């Protein structure tokens, strides 16, 4: 309980004191921890004569849209892997980015359509869980060769 004190002045010169009690509460939520175990890796890609989209799905599969000769080359593309730990039964909500840019020797490459292989809102199971994040990479025609890198943020929030 907290004590509240209020001074009131009447029309005269008398000061009256009024004391009341009210309850103050606070809900402390258990901590949630998010750890990145491995990065989102598009692997090695050969750009084509036309723009294309290379997708690493959250389940680890890959796909290509748009054609133009875009293809993976001797690599093992993989989704990012994350670990969530905390008190079992805690409600959570994952937040993924809309889009990011990869920077390298040529023009920037856009990564978009991020997806996770778990429900974005959910309840933490006993022992926590791992989940994977995939996304699509837009590759322009004749993109300059080289290493392209960027950073994306995944947040775990309380709903």
Named regions from a protein language model:
Residues 1-94, 123-159:
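N-terminal small/polar-rich segments of proteins
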Residues 23-25, 102, 113:
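Short N-terminal segments immediately surrounding and downstream of signal-peptide cleavage
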Residues 105-117:
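Short beta-strand and strand-turn-strand segments in soluble, beta-rich domains
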Residues 94-102:
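Short acidic, flexible loop segments centered on an aromatic residue
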């Amino acid at each position: 309980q907290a004590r509240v004190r209020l001074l009131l002045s009447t029309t005269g010169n008398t000061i009256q004191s009024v004391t009341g009690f009210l309850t103050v509460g606070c809900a402390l939520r258990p901590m949630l921890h998010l750890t990145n175990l491995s990065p989102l890796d598009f692997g090695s890609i050969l750009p084509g004569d036309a723009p294309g989209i290379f997708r690493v799905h959250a389940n680890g599969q890959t796909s290509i849209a748009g054609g133009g000769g875009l293809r993976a080359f001797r690599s093992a593309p993989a989704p990012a892997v994350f670990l969530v730990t905390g008190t079992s039964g805690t409600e959570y909500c994952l937040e993924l980015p809309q889009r990011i840019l990869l920077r390298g020797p040529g023009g920037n490459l856009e990564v978009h359509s991020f997806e996770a292989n778990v429900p974005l809102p959910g309840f933490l199971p006993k022992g926590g869980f791992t989940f994977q994040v995939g996304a699509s990479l837009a590759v322009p025609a004749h993109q300059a060769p080289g290493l392209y890198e960027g950073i994306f943020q995944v947040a775990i929030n309380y709903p």
